[in-house]
Amino acid sequence: TRGGYLNKFTTVVASIIGVSSLYKVPTKPTTLSPPFISPKPGFMSLPPRKHEVVGGASSSLVAAAVSARNSVISEDLFEGLALFDKASSLEDDGGDNVSEFQASIDDVNDGGGGGGDDELAVSRLGLPQKLVETLEKRGITKLFPIQRAVLVPALEGRDIIGRAKTGTGKTLAFAIPIIKRLTEEDEDNRNSLAGRLPRVLVLAPTRELAKQVETEIKEPAPYLRTVCVYGGVS
């Protein structure tokens, strides 16, 4: 019968694999070892964050980032992320404190804790005048948190790892330093010959993202020549 066949099949499998390997019962609770708990050269730790695991136990997972001479990771990059996490929790609670969350968002966007409007105004960042004019035409008069956090390290040529929610200006965050440098080079070499090799290469994982990156660079700097290259099209 079918039941007898299954019993025989289970017996054969158990005899080959071993019953002890099929049913393993831990003799004592297993604890997770948070990575990079002890100080290590070349790493800087971020504040631990609680995560729930199976069985009700919890562990503190500590994120870390390389802090080499030419690399940087700014705590300002994660300031907005903490606010978005707060927004999610407020939605779960029914949204009673949405106004409080919006006030905190406005404080960050207005430069709260890191400078005022004058400091974040694009006209006071040392950007080329024609770049400032095109940004202002698009309604961009001051930087968002992610843009503020990466601007100086990017202009210094340092490696950056940052994260922010969709729609918070991540693409323009790295596009502004690129446009600034290319514009200044063009102004210093007005008589240089055309037909040079590409000076900047931006890699994107998808065709749609590649098009988006080109748009974000081309709109504030129409005087620069950009080319979007992708495959998969007949």
Curated annotation (Swiss-Prot):
| Induction entry | Down-regulated in response to mixed metal ion contamination (cadmium, copper, lead and zinc), but not in response to zinc ion contamination.
Provide the GO MF annotations for this entry: ATP binding; hydrolase activity; RNA binding; RNA helicase activity
Keywords assigned = ATP-binding, Helicase, Hydrolase, Nucleotide-binding, RNA-binding
Task: Please report the stretch or stretches of sequence annotated as the Helicase ATP-binding domain.
Answer: 151-234
Q: What class of enzyme is it?
A: hydrolase
Q: Where does ATP bind?
A: A164, K165, T166, G167, T168, G169, K170, T171
EC number(s) reported in the record: 3.6.1.-
Stored InterPro entries:
DEAD/DEAH_box_helicase_dom (IPR011545), DEAD_box_RNA_helicase (IPR050079), Helicase_ATP-bd (IPR014001), P-loop_NTPase (IPR027417), RNA_helicase_DEAD_Q_motif (IPR014014)
For this protein, the parts annotated as crossing the membrane are: none
Per the Swiss-Prot or TrEMBL record, what residue ranges does the short sequence motif Q motif cover?
120-148
What top-level branch of life does the organism fall under? Answer: Eukaryota
Alphabetized Gene3D superfamilies for the sequence: P-loop containing nucleotide triphosphate hydrolases (3.40.50.300)
**Entry text on domains:** The Q motif is unique to and characteristic of the DEAD box family of RNA helicases and controls ATP binding and hydrolysis.
Family statement? Belongs to the DEAD box helicase family. DDX21/DDX50 subfamily.
Name of this chain's protein: DEAD-box ATP-dependent RNA helicase 3
**From what organism does this protein derive?**
Helianthus annuus
